[in-house]
């Protein structure tokens, strides 16, 4: 009996010490391309620019998909001028990887820089204090990578510790929070700059009569970048936390390898999403919640704030229904989906940014819609689910 008590006491003692040093998000910045498309008129543009106007039934099907998406607009680097200069991007099966790569290796770091500069400005500290840079994108692959290019664009120290993550998919935003937490808590005085930048040029192509997944991809994804500064030991009076990263977990849903897949081919990045994905995610989300929140005695999912990756409207609806969430719980996720589309890795950071800004505007008590505890959910190929427990901070 005494041995058991000692073990429990030690466990709680270690946990208490760990909580005292949890990583904090100190600043968030976001950026989007200047050009954007209206979802209601996009089917006309898409079938015209890809010389596919004769596919009338396919066009009407695409229009229905866009109308059901609950997306109002999306920002895109792709413009009519760019597509006319590179017509090989507009045909479904055209060899075009070189063209896509040439655009992405230039544009991804630039968009990342815009978001990073906003985060650094809000942080308010000298850029020389950044000790780590973690860059994530599903848009292209290059060496030296986007992390190297961003280091030069920002003028970071040549000794900054860099890590480049390519091809992680939609769960990468939550995974980056997990990685930033581990880095910040393992390096005293560390200041981690995290950047997620996504551009959909790799996935854009004309319609295919055989591949309906392609139409979903053309409707769903948008371009954007998000950045944040993370540290475990913020300086009082000099740095102001926005959220606290409490714990993190990742799990693979068994027997779902083929449910969500992206493959890099000569034609670019191909996309497949099974119709079962919304149901499978809804069936597995609660188990992740229970395991994550059990140590903290939380089991009412309406008592926490939600930063849920909006992979698509059907997924958001199914999870909301399965967990019995109130309509306001996933509002921030729905708002980001409506205004930007699915931003892949950048999505959850956009949601965090929107949430803390709206919480302040609405005169809430905390950055998390007035609540203390919250969860970040990301999911992607695998199916892989990342679960991050976060805490808000009081709004002064």
UniProtKB/Swiss-Prot annotation:
Catalytic activity, EC: 2.3.1.74
Active-site residue numbers: 170
SUPFAM superfamilies assigned: Thiolase-like (SSF53901)
Key words, A-Z: Acyltransferase, Flavonoid biosynthesis, Transferase
Known catalytic reactions: (E)-4-coumaroyl-CoA + 3 malonyl-CoA + 3 H(+) = 2',4,4',6'-tetrahydroxychalcone + 3 CO2 + 4 CoA
Pathway, per record: Secondary metabolite biosynthesis; flavonoid biosynthesis
Gene Ontology BP term (one): polyketide biosynthetic process
Keyword Transferase set for record: yes
Pfam annotation, one family: Chal_sti_synt_C
Enzyme class, first EC level, given as a word: transferase
The keyword DNA-binding is annotated on this UniProt entry: no
GO molecular function, one term: naringenin-chalcone synthase activity
Similarity annotation: Belongs to the thiolase-like superfamily. Chalcone/stilbene synthases family.
UniProt function note: The primary product of this enzyme is 4,2',4',6'-tetrahydroxychalcone (also termed naringenin-chalcone or chalcone) which can under specific conditions spontaneously isomerize into naringenin.
Protein name: Chalcone synthase B
Species this chain originates from: Ipomoea purpurea (Common morning glory)
């Amino acid at each position: 009996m005494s041995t058991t008590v000692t073990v429990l006491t030690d466990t709680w003692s270690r946990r208490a010490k760990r909580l005292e040093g949890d990583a904090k998000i100190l600043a968030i910045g976001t950026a989007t391309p200047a050009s954007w498309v209206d979802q209601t008129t996009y089917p006309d543009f898409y079938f015209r620019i890809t010389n596919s106007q004769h596919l009338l039934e396919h066009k009407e099907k695409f229009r229905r998909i866009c109308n059901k998406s609950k997306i109002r607009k999306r920002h895109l680097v792709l413009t009519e001028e760019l597509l006319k200069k590179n017509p090989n991007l507009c045909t479904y099966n055209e060899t075009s990887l070189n063209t896509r790569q040439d655009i992405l290796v230039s544009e991804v770091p630039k968009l990342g820089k815009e978001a990073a500069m906003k985060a650094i400005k809000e942080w308010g500290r000298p850029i020389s204090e950044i000790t780590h840079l973690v860059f994530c994108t599903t848009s292209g692959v290059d060496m030296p990578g986007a992390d190297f290019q961003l280091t030069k664009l920002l003028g970071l120290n040549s000794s900054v510790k860099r890590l480049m993550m390519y091809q992680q998919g939609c769960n990468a935003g939550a995974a980056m929070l997990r990685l930033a937490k581990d880095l910040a808590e393992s390096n005293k005085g560390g200041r981690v700059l995290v950047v997620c930048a996504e551009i959909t040029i790799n996935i854009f192509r004309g319609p295919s009569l055989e591949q309906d997944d392609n139409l979903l991809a053309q409707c769903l994804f948008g371009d954007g970048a998000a950045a944040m500064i993370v540290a475990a030991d913020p300086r009082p009076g000099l740095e102001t936390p926005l959220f606290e990263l409490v714990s993190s977990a990742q799990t693979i849903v068994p027997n779902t390898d083929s449910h969500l897949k992206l493959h890099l081919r000569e034609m670019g990045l191909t996309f497949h999403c099974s119709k079962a994905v919304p149901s499978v995610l809804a069936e597995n989300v609660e188990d992740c919640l229970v395991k994550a929140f059990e140590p903290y005695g939380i089991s009412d999912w309406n008592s926490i704030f939600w930063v849920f990756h909006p992979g698509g409207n059907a997924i958001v609806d199914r999870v909301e229904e399965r967990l019995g969430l109130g309509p306001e719980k996933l509002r921030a996720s729905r708002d980001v989906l409506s205004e930007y589309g699915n931003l892949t890795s950048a999505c959850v950071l956009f949601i965090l940014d929107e949430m803390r800004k709206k919480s302040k505007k609405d005169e809430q008590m905390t950055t998390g819609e007035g609540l203390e505890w919250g969860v970040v959910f990301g999911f992607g190929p695998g199916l892989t689910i990342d679960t991050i427990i976060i805490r808000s901070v009081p709004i002064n």
